[in-house]
Amino acid sequence: DKQIVIVNNIQPPPSPAEPELRTINLYGDISERKGADVVAALLYLESSSHVLGLEDPKDSESAQVIVARSIAMMISTHGGTASDMFSILDVMDMVKDRTCDIETFGIGKVMSAGVPILAAGTKGKRKVGRNCRIMLHNVMAGTGGTIFSMENELEEIKWVQERYIETLASYTKLTPSKIKKLLKAQRDVYISAEEAIKMGIADEII
């Protein structure tokens, strides 16, 4: 029978988690609702990460030790809001630091806000589909209202753009100046799976 274990009142979230597979499906636009679902899934799967396992998995007679099972994230998205991307990234970093590895898989398309999430996986465990298309572009926002509110909005957009660049650089082989150069053309920058490996966005092609 299927058993559901509740730890500290944390229950399996509905979509997008697959508890038995320890997999989170991040498909579609990254919205406030999607961000909340992914964060809930990360925290639930983190709570059930530690299990008894063999010290040497190849030796059935080796001592039993507590091991941390990794979490997998399947990613296929056109992107979404920066604030919800940052909420996912902050929780991913927290889980990696204190509990377990996170394996990321980019399939189909990984664009805009989805790119740092793919790159935020544990180094050596970030994979991308051979036919996956990756895309970077400048932060976008609609402005309106008085000139003062538009100036305020512009300052916020600049801050988000700088933070996006710094964050992506921290996960990859790209420097902030290299990312700014890529984005300088004011257009969408499409990247192949092979280029993503060279840039350090992912580690392996599947």
Report residues per predicted region:
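Terminal-region recognition feature
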Residues: 1-206
